[in-house]
């Protein structure tokens, strides 16, 4: 263990001990979502199954609650709801990555090791350089390849902006390793490039899989390549997008998916036109706080997605917190009816307790949870004939609360945290609901400081975070429609807390 890695590990231990010994701090934190053990986290990394456990690495800065020189933090889980802290996996401690170990992915090898592919950041004079590196590990400790970096500008047969070449996605197919990375072209547009290797150490450039066009975006980040229910798919997070309400995009950073055919002979991705928005890519989650999603396929056949539950554009962590950053609930993915569906992992249902059924008459308000911790699940559905709005309010007073509004007249969903502890630069978000069917189904997962909404059995997701000064609050529903609403509520508790 290098001195830099040892220092990071010591800091992680100190923060974790402080947090776990304080009931006040624990009450600030989510119950079943992963949150940084102290300090800062952003992108999920290396999300994979290895040696009987699910591994989640993440971009980690243990020395403050702001972004800083990147390390790789590491946790493991078996149920994707309870997270066990592991030693810090990577620190910026070699010439290839002395300015940061940026995002990447992980896979298992036939000899029983785990390969991490990550971006090493260094400098050439005053200029930042991003290259790709690898490390090998046993699920606990990781050793960087002595000949890092394994991919540099020398591997790419055209000019690009060398401070924007990152986020390797590594996978294996037909006995060969493949790596997809993103880079910024000289015209400032993002592109996804692909490389091939026999041993994951020496790589050959094969082509541009896909790239931005028609002023779609600037740089792309965090690529993922997968086949979901027989459909080839790319996932990436484009920057510098312009708001297009009808297409489902917002200003700044988005996270999108594209379907089509990945041709391994031409090394090109031929994308479909997405049914949701008539564009080559569609939004994955329409809320404020969702970025850099990453997937893994489990041994039980499920494809699981997890993402950073925060927005670069809107930092809202309270100043006195020892931690900043958490992940979405892991989501089971499927592709059906020509679109992506996502739902919380089925293991979440094991946390359900105290089921309550409630009716809210037309033009009435009801308190569903009274002065409770915000660990709950709420479900309701309304018929296609229902018009008006349904408001879900979390808070104790008119001075501090958050609002989720379902508008069945204009078919929209809206979140407002302007009355929360820290609204941030982006305090509200509005998005179109899917076209009406016989009924609109709403499922809401609340966990202390987040609301994740799943519409119509996972056809749409809408994720937002917030902070309130009180840990126990009311959950109220205002039914501003002409029909009664029948809803079902559960408290969500860990087994040991029951």
Briefly describe each language-model feature range:
Residues 1-167, 172-216, 229-286, 309-358, ...:
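Beta-rich carbohydrate-recognition and catalytic domains
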Residues 14-20, 253-498:
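Beta-rich accessory regions
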Residues 42, 220, 290:
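Short, well-structured alpha-helical interface segments that form or flank functional binding sites
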